[in-house]
Amino acid sequence: MHRLFILRHAKAATHPPTASGRDHDRPLAARGAAVLPRVARSIADQLEGHPLDLVLCSTSTRTRETVDLVAQAEPAVAAARLKLDDKLYLADPARLLKTLRKVHDDKATVLLCGHNPGLHQLALLLLGDDGSDNGSEHVLARLRYDLPTAGLVVVDLDGSWTSVGTGPGIRGAKLRAFVVPSDT
């Protein structure tokens, strides 16, 4: 079994615009940075003492800052191999799945940090209608509504990374947790 942590970047600054004027370069807002220690605790809880093997992160400033601040608060994230990938910037679910399918199966736990709407759509795709068999139907219903900034979705996946997201209804993907920082 593999565990996937899907983390949307924390709240980014909107004004003033960056010197470059590019969305890619927007940093985190102070309130976005402030919630990340709580997100780090949630990741630690869901790792259950196991190491985090790999962090896949968009190259945008806000995603890199999100991962950096989570790593400062959680040693397992700091110890994980970090791979920055410019193809994850505003990636759609197809691109995200392509990236996940390249992960080696010896990586049991992977954190993917990126952007909506792709991350939200990926989580919904993986979970389909059968993603909750552990009494978390209300949590899955809430996730269908939104993946907010700094939202964390933890999914357990059967099978290999190369087969993630294949087949109708994506059988074998189970929602383990959906954490919204304002709830912690």
Map each language-model feature to its residues.
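Residue-level preference for the first positions of well-ordered beta-strands
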Residues: 4, 109-111, 152
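Conserved histidine-centered catalytic loops in small-molecule metabolism enzymes
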Residues: 52-74, 159-184
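Glycine-rich phosphate-binding loop signature in dinucleotide/nucleotide-binding domains
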Residues: 46-50, 103-108
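Short, well-ordered alpha-helical microsegments
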Residues: 63-66, 93, 119-120
